[in-house]
UniProtKB/Swiss-Prot annotation:
Protein name in UniProt: S-adenosylmethionine:tRNA ribosyltransferase-isomerase
Gene that encodes it: queA
Listed EC numbers: 2.4.99.17
Subunit relationships: Monomer.
Family named by the database record: Belongs to the QueA family.
Function of the molecule: Transfers and isomerizes the ribose moiety from AdoMet to the 7-aminomethyl group of 7-deazaguanine (preQ1-tRNA) to give epoxyqueuosine (oQ-tRNA).
PANTHER family from the UniProt entry: S-ADENOSYLMETHIONINE:TRNA RIBOSYLTRANSFERASE-ISOMERASE
Gene Ontology biological process terms in this record: queuosine biosynthetic process; tRNA wobble guanine modification
Species, as recorded: Rhodopseudomonas palustris (strain ATCC BAA-98 / CGA009)
Length: 360
């Protein structure tokens, strides 16, 4: 399909720079096949689901993946900014760096800011290799959990580019950019649909007979990238690591067999569930990378309902929701959202989408 079909104009005032408080007070646009759009709030979610439905949340935790440092040991010491995007092993990370032209294989970058170092000493990394578009492979001086601790001490919250271009990250983002489910470190971006949940909402859902299950997909920086190819068939999807336990898979399969719906909280949960689904719709245990790319024409096997935020033009995520509900339906829904002041992107409002081949 032509990528331009998924483009739209978004006024800057519709981009949220901070979340609402409390989290479940965010607006939520309900999109059902063949029904009028409904303007609700996230707190209404229990009334929109049914006993036996099963929510699936992503429990990945965002790391302090934004690092600032200087190249050392080769004359001038230019400032280097790095965003960690994918862990390769205990000491090696793939990263996006600026300015990449200042680095060569073999160079050493010392990370920290304002003279700050981690408790274990300087956090140094050697450039092992350079790729295209600012990508480098960094080999750090620490390994495993020790490296994780060092990154947490000198790094900063990696805000999405559409927020970072407007303001710097601050202490509030440390809390705001984690979901209440965040427990497994490894993401460089938040699974943002989960940001809307509160303990009170979780309790209300349980009281209505709605189950809740955790899976893990470590969200990568590629989630923010627009599709530059003119045709979707030419786009190369980024890979992300995910896990679904055997117990969770069995519970979801049993609930669905009993008539319950699978409600994915976020596109990351949906992509992982669909990656683990068999042709008959049953979900298998999963522990692997997935680079699933969902566009209109895809046959959904595992997910019946999707709760998700509002996404970027020409993004793989807008393509995904268009596959889920139909392109015409989502174009109309987004036009309504823009016209009525819904807040877009990571800190923005939510939508609740019912699959276009299922009657809710």
């Amino acid at each position: 399909m032509r990528t331009e079909l998924f483009d739209f104009d978004l006024p800057a005032e519709n981009i949220a720079l901070r979340p609402v408080s409390p989290r479940d007070a965010a607006r939520m646009l309900v999109v059902r096949p063949g029904a009028p759009l409904e303007d609700r709030i996230v707190r209404d979610l229990p009334a929109l689901l049914a006993p036996g439905d099963q929510l699936v949340v992503n429990d990945t935790r965002v790391i302090a993946a934004q690092l600032t440092g200087r190249r050392i040991g080769r004359g001038l010491e230019p400032k280097i900014e790095a965003t960690l995007i994918k862990r390769l092993d205990g000491a090696r990370w793939q990263a996006l760096v600026k300015p990449a032209k200042k680095l060569l294989p073999g160079d050493v970058v010392r990370f920290g800011h304002d003279g700050r170092v981690c408790l274990l000493g300087h956090l140094d990394a050697t450039v092992e290799a350079k790729g295209d578009a600012g990508e480098v492979t960094l080999v750090f001086s620490f390994h495993g959990p020790v490296l994780d601790q060092a990154i947490a001490e000198v790094g900063a919250t990696p805000l999405p580019p559409y927020i970072a271009s407007k303001r710097a990250p601050d202490a509030q983002d440390i809390a705001d950019y984690q979901t209440m489910f965040a427990s497994n470190e490894g993401a460089v971006a938040a699974p943002t649909a989960g940001l809307h949940f509160t303990a009170e909402l979780e309790t209300a859902l349980a009281a209505c007979g709605v189950g809740l299950h955790r899976i893990t997909l470590h969200v990568g920086a590629g989630t923010f990238l627009p599709v530059k190819a003119e045709d979707t068939s030419e786009h190369r999807m980024h890979a992300e690591w995910g896990t679904i336990s055997s117990g969770t898979a069995e519970a979801l399969n049993a609930a669905r067999a009993a008539g319950g719906r699978i409600v994915a909280v976020g596109t990351t949960s949906l992509r992982l569930l669909e990656s683990a689904a068999r042709d008959d719709g049953r979900i298998a245990p999963f522990a692997d990378e997935t680079s699933i790319f969902i566009t209109p024409g895809y046959r959904f096997r595992a997910v019946d309902v999707l709760m998700t935020n509002f996404h970027l033009p020409r993004s793989t995520l807008f393509m995904l929701v268009s596959a889920f509900c139909g392109l015409d339906t989502m174009q109309a829904a987004y036009a309504h959202a823009i016209r009525t002041g819904y807040r877009f992107y990571s800190y923005g409002d939510a939508s609740l989408l019912f699959r276009n081949d299922i009657t809710p």
